[in-house]
Amino acid sequence: MLTTPQHYAYIKIAEGCNNFCAFCIIPHLRGRYRSRAVEDILQEARGLAESGVKELIVVAQDTSRYGTDLYGAPRLPLLLHELCRIEGFHWIRVHYLYPDMITDELLDTFASEPKLVNYMDIPIQHVNDAILRRMNRRGTRAELDEMLQKLRSRLPDAVIRTSLITGLPGEGEAEFEELCAWLRENKLERVGAFVFSPEDGTPAAKMEHADEEVAQRRAEIIAELQSRIMDEYNAARVGTVMEVLCEGEEPETGRCFGRTYADSPDIDGRVLFSAARSVSPGEFVMVRITGAEDGDLVGEMEENA
């Protein structure tokens, strides 16, 4: 049963997690990673398309690991190609791609499939190598930087979302400043800042970590930095024409609102736009961006859209 507006829906392709990050309880609660069979996923997806879903959002604790347990190797590219063949979907969005599993094959898949939106949700958490090792995160900062450079080169219009955690065990002022400097350099388009919260039963809960007040202040600094980065991103959109998925109308202003490919439901921004005709939720229209307002884009629907 759909629990989202009819024009978009989530499809879970796997359950559980094998990553065992030191701060996360999920593998202990949900068990080992278990992929669904390709045909099982496709059957559900076809039903969603037939019901009128226009945007399919692919999720799992780690979508990039899909298929490793069932087929002996990652099969996310294959699955995405098959999903793109289903008639009815206009956008297919993928969440939770782990940095070390973003391969050339996966990037080629995004580049070659028009339905796949270039929105990369990549849980990074931190970039200091010592903290990454302590938190049992795979990969290093150098490997992350190399992957991001390749991603930006292969998908120039990619929007990258991530979450960063402040106050992790081992994070002092130097490690925090390294994180800030990295964010200023890489200018990720979408970032959520969270304060480390020890989870009972995890290794990190037993480790010494930053004072909660200090961690909260650091999260606020990250949020302020990201706000400036997002303002730059929005300013660069002014004057362009973007495809927008309409989601409704503001009763108080009469303006329509919707999302671009750069915005996932509930967690990212919106586009507020005026329209000379009635626009239905779930309809795709072209909008000329004229400005920004409190983090959201503002525009006017193209008359021939």
What are these regions (language model features)?
Residues 3-7, 17-19, 116, 126, ...:
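Short flexible coil/turn linkers enriched for glycine and charged/polar residues
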Residues 198, 206-305:
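Terminal RNA-binding accessory module
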Residues 1-66, 105, 116, 120, ...:
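Proteins enriched for Cys/Gly/acidic motifs involved in redox and nucleic-acid/cofactor modification
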Residues 50-174, 184:
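Conserved SAM/AdoMet-binding glycine-rich loop
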Residues 54, 90, 189, 283, ...:
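Short acidic/polar active-site loop segments enriched in Thr and Asp
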Residues 21, 41, 58, 94, ...:
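Conserved, mostly hydrophobic/aromatic
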